[in-house]
């Protein structure tokens, strides 16, 4: 029998490929035996088999394929991606089968990124990944989103995740407008210690890995050309409801009468202007986008090249962004063992920063005239009695624009001495240059009134840096039961930034604008320059071990050295350990049909945050003047104390998760629980006044984050003509301050007008919390005031506040916790349906249980007559309406308006984020020769919003204000509205 089989054996050869590219290392095994081989660097294999044998072809991330040998001597196989747990995901410095992951990684596909038109990729992540909160704080063209991965770990430092684009660490200051979203192949978000420890001191806030598209069509000389063209119309969303012109006049007159001031509007309302500032300053605005890419490959070269043009006008007039982006990705196989290539991205951006704010539309009285009687622009506010910055004049006369050039590249070389070893070195330069030109005309009416002349400034920022990564990877199977992958590497990065700014005042001739700053008053001009830089050296390693494909272990360690710290604290080690148990591979699970995959995993580790400016360990010298012998002298003095003991903020994280694939892959669910504790928080601590300073930055305090995440992906219906899939993302995060360096609380100021007391860091509370006094409505009678025991002035109809400490005075000492901007629940829910050539999807996202601090309440609800009022103020307290709880006009002149509970509103909301209808043209039936596929689509974005918030959109926020962006979360003063958008587009491939 044996001799017969040998005589009829034959040599089979061929190549194994996937998605147009050869697959080195693919397994080729004779089914039912242990006999097999693997493909070489070119994807080529040879094996001896009989005609009756079945060859099984397999590769990580792709579905197995079986082929009967028969009479064939050459069998070429193309594998298809396996979209179950065996899909390949990108991790730090490599890839891994999803089924082998021991850490928490969320994947966002290119389809999810491009389902609705966005100018920045971060805008496309909202609601797409459990545990990742994305807040679109502004609808301005090109505006950044705020991203929190499993909560914020720092109080004063950055809480933004680390962005890594094609292996290039770009940091939190990188402008994501530089990247074309249509170039993106996939996005992975690393969330737990096991995943992020490989990035050490910069991984504590999570890591976002962006992988761009590469060449396809290996072995084919014919390139593939794709084009994606769309146009959008943005519409102004629902706006806050304000008093009518006549109602506003009545309110302003009441306020003046109560204060004993002159009545500003003594005549009939019809004799005064009735300007709709929303209509004057906001309006529909278009978006134009064109993407063209070419991709292909020859025997040894694969390439992807694209060009993108994007132009978005803003719904707030004079705002907008125009972008040109070029990308080229090239891979060259020099030999069986040597490969090289590059990833290059260049962008040019012209951003119009806007000459008027949305706040102008909310705040300006409808009675404020635009023009004087002689036709010139009005520049004086009669109600306030001071010069007024006329927004219509600003749009016509002034300039505020930013130009940016960015080059981001990565050049690599791979050497594979054998199938088990890969040695890689990359060099990644990053150059960014921006220039902001600002000009305010001398003819601006408020400046004409003051006689100050115009002003202009030119600000240039040049950032240059490089990153060198060197890794060596070894992977091997030891016997039938053991599989290991080991990675070691070293990373070096250097970044420097130079800023030069010139400001000129007293410009009398507008002809040259900001192009001739010498045309000004030299005694008032300001010249500034600044330089900063840092270097990081890192050494890291990772070991992945699998036993019988059931038990998985991952060990990670990284040592970072940073120039921002002193010599004694320059280096820190970040370790992690993770393990996973594939329960579904156990013998007792083999006879059940529910679970295809069932995995329990856990991880624990340490990551860091070097959340300080490069020179904060050192003292700061500032310019100071003194008088010697009657002559003023200028010198330098110490303006900030040094602290050589500053070190890294460190976060220790625990993650436990259960993953399950059920019912033949039709249901995939994942449940995570995590706990994070951050120590050595960087805070300004009060120090003895004998030092000459009030405070010093120190490592004190700690906080914790804990929460859960749940994701569910289901295939509800799957037939030849109809498919229906659903995705649900739920997550909840709670944080708490554990220690503030020995004090119970720290008061902070988020808004200068509100003064202190509107936010406070409190041990045992979240970061941040809103604080203020309790608003109790209005005083209904003098008897009620007299019985209250309050010693400070009160007035019938005025605002009534709770005296928390009972001292008879309403002050910040009466402040209590009023709420938190952190939601109890973050959710996203998507349904995708396809019938024959039609695709339809809709996507909801939102939050529940968060509060918003409405900064507009002070001016538009309480008693300042020079500002417009919310429509509900028409029902305010008056002698004829004595039961109202809305304060009377002018009452603030007696009681003041401290930060109070009326400012805090429910921020829970549901947003219909995206609706998309697409038709995939049957190009073959339509006789469209040369066209591979064509899709026409219609998309709606931000179509509906359910919210009780007065300013309509609760996502608007003051992140970044006063340099305390983490604390300003949830503070909303009516930021730039998120528009409703309708998009019509065509995607075609030749």
Swiss-Prot record:
Source domain of life: Bacteria
Compartments reported by the entry: Cell outer membrane
Domain TBDR beta-barrel: 220-990
Chain intervals for the UniProt region annotation (Disordered): 878-902
Swiss-Prot/TrEMBL keywords: Cell outer membrane, Membrane, Receptor, TonB box, Transmembrane, Transmembrane beta strand, Transport
Induction: By ulvan and rhamnose.
SUPFAM superfamilies named among the record's database cross-references: Carboxypeptidase regulatory domain-like, Porins
Motif (TonB C-terminal box): 974-990
Gene3D superfamilies assigned: Carboxypeptidase-like, regulatory domain, TonB-dependent receptor, beta-barrel domain, TonB-dependent receptor, plug domain
Bilayer topology term: Multi-pass membrane protein
TBDR plug domain mapped to chain residues: 97-213
Locus of motif TonB box: 86-93
Transmembrane segments: none
Protein family according to the UniProt entry: Belongs to the TonB-dependent receptor family.
Function: TonB-dependent receptor probably involved in ulvan degradation. Ulvan is the main polysaccharide component of the Ulvales (green seaweed) cell wall. It is composed of disaccharide building blocks comprising 3-sulfated rhamnose (Rha3S) linked to D-glucuronic acid (GlcA), L-iduronic acid (IduA), or D-xylose (Xyl). The TonB-dependent receptor may mediate transport of ulvan oligosaccharides from the surface of the outer membrane to the periplasm for subsequent degradation.
Name of protein: TonB-dependent receptor P26
Organism: Formosa agariphila (strain DSM 15362 / KCTC 12365 / LMG 23005 / KMM 3901 / M-2Alg 35-1)
